A protein has these predicted regions:
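Alpha/propeptide regions of enzymes that mature by internal proteolysis
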Residues: 7-387
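Position-driven detector of the extreme protein N-terminus
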Residues: 2-5
């Protein structure tokens, strides 16, 4: 249920912000949390106003760390427009966020906030309850341009510099229970594990290496605990009920947000090019290889390639082929084991499409992707010639 309120040249009294003045702002009520806190959307920002005392742990550069005096937390889409870069209101990111907090009617000293390039209308909100305990996740996210794997090569070093790459997964996690600061920190670990689990279950690839993504390069998280609650917990790990609720809630919300923002979901991932993107295999790379065999119009080729890319047999065998390569790169299988299994898979794919198989010369990313690409091209070429 939404609460649309048009505000024009009038003073507006909000929870904890009685002296705030807004002009021309539209407020939409998104959700009321079990804590009594309320989430609103103000155009390109989502603000959660606290009804009482809260413990907050934030990874944000702006007023991050552990605090017990905050009145609200927020998430802001900094893009000027769709597909455009984020607008900077000051020379530093911290000052930019301070100015932004004032613009949306907050007291900068009493809030923490996160910036993103994700659209606020694509927010996903999930909540789970066990007995008296409720956990709520408010998530925006997109990793198509900035998804990476921890340990990937990086180009950002200066402590005061703000990376300009976009595509963050921002999480506001609200725990309707009191807890010591250490447990709040443990909840952050569990929350991060859940985010990574969601991404890996979608087999989203890194944009900076051949690995599976574990997040984006600029993910941020805010954890909120209810200091006023009679419930008091000292555990938020995977063996605790709170940890279970955090895991399930965050995983579901992250998947929903990625689907809304980027179209990243099981349906779109049912395509070999989506799975092979991290290995630099694309329709364009296949087209360049195909041109050496047949003179066919590119639109006709692309239609045939996309159709083949989504066929169950091609996707299933290719998925196994990719996982062999992953396990080789992780040191779990040696070259002989991978060579033997990969050649069998290439032969099986060829047999399914009545095409001559391709020999695999060595086990490496380049060699395995070359062999697969040549086989894929041969299948398309043979199909065209048969028809």
């Amino acid at each position: 249920m939404t609460d649309m309120i048009g505000i024009k040249n009038i003073s507006v009294f909000l929870p904890g912000q009685e002296d705030t003045f807004f002009t021309g702002v539209v407020r939409m009520k998104l959700y009321t949390v079990s804590t009594g806190d309320t989430a609103y959307r103000y155009e390109k920002s989502i603000v959660v106003f606290f009804k009482g005392a809260r413990k907050v742990l934030s990874t944000s550069v702006f007023n991050g760390g552990y605090h017990e005096n905050y009145k609200a937390v927020f998430n802001h889409d900094g893009k000027v427009g769709s597909g455009m870069p984020c607008e900077m209101l000051a020379d530093t990111y911290t000052e930019h966020m301070r100015i932004l907090a004032k613009r949306i009617g907050l007291e900068p000293e009493l809030v923490t906030g996160m910036g993103t390039a994700a659209d606020m209308e694509n927010v996903a909100i999930e909540s789970l309850t066990y007995k008296e305990l409720t956990v709520t996740a408010i998530v925006t996210g997109g990793i198509e341009t900035n998804g990476g794997r921890v340990g990937d090569p990086a180009d950002y070093y200066k402590p005061a510099e703000k990376p300009d790459k976009l595509g963050t997964i921002n999480i506001i996690l609200i725990l309707d229970a009191d807890m010591p600061p250490g447990t709040l920190a443990r909840a952050l670990v569990t929350c991060t594990e859940a985010k990574t689990a969601a991404i890996q279950e979608l087999l989203a690839g890194s944009n900076y290496s051949t690995g599976l993504a574990t997040g984006s390069g600029t993910d941020q998280t805010i954890i909120v605990a209810n200091s006023d609650s009679a419930l008091y917990f000292e555990g938020a790990g995977k063996h605790s009920k709170m940890g279970e609720l955090i895991g399930k809630t965050v995983t579901k919300a992250v998947k929903a947000a990625l689907s809304k923002q980027s179209g990243l979901n099981p349906k779109t991932q049912h395509n070999v090019f989506r799975r092979l993107k991290r290995f630099q295999v694309t329709t364009q790379s296949i087209w360049l290889l195909f041109q050496q065999q047949l003179a066919v119009l590119k639109p006709d080729f692309l239609e045939a390639a996309e159709k083949l890319a989504q066929e169950p047999v091609m996707l299933t065998y290719t998925s196994l082929y990719i996982h062999l390569l992953d396990q080789f790169l992780w040191g779990l299988l040696d070259k002989d084991e991978v060579m033997n299994a990969a050649e069998k898979l290439l032969s099986d794919i060829a047999g399914e499409y009545d095409t001559e198989s391709i020999a695999l010369n060595e086990v490496s990313v380049e060699a395995m992707m070359k062999a697969w690409s040549e086989l894929f091209v041969n299948i398309i070429a043979d199909n065209i010639q048969r028809n």
